[in-house]
């Protein structure tokens, strides 16, 4: 909600996201072999074909849409998207963003997906199913974003001293 309430934050965030998603991208093969060249070309054609409205799966994001969605990690510190695979493992349709609230870090700094059977702890994420992007260098991914310092900045710029002290006293927030 912070970008909705503070136009300067919204403007800076939009500028950064547009700069990231506006950059060009290309794939390079891992080595000079014909097999690596073919794999890189096949992946590029798969990425170019992503993004559509699937009748059963709903809206599927394209690769530039994935890059834009993963830039959501700027504020909360992490972002994730599901890879929507084609049947039989022959390529993929595209990507579907997953909101941050569906992840749990209760047991460790490794993300776990919250499901109906595992609401608090979450369950382990299957390999090759989710792309997870985090901004922090080790440590807690939830604290890696810009949301905490921006919340303090917003609080100090919008509330007078009396209201801030009243809020801190009422909700027991330590003043750090």
Across the structure, where does each feature detected by a protein language model lie?
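N-terminal-proximal low-complexity accessory segments that begin disordered
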Residues: 1-22
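Structured, contiguous alpha/beta core segments that scaffold functional sites
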Residues: 18, 29-30, 35-176
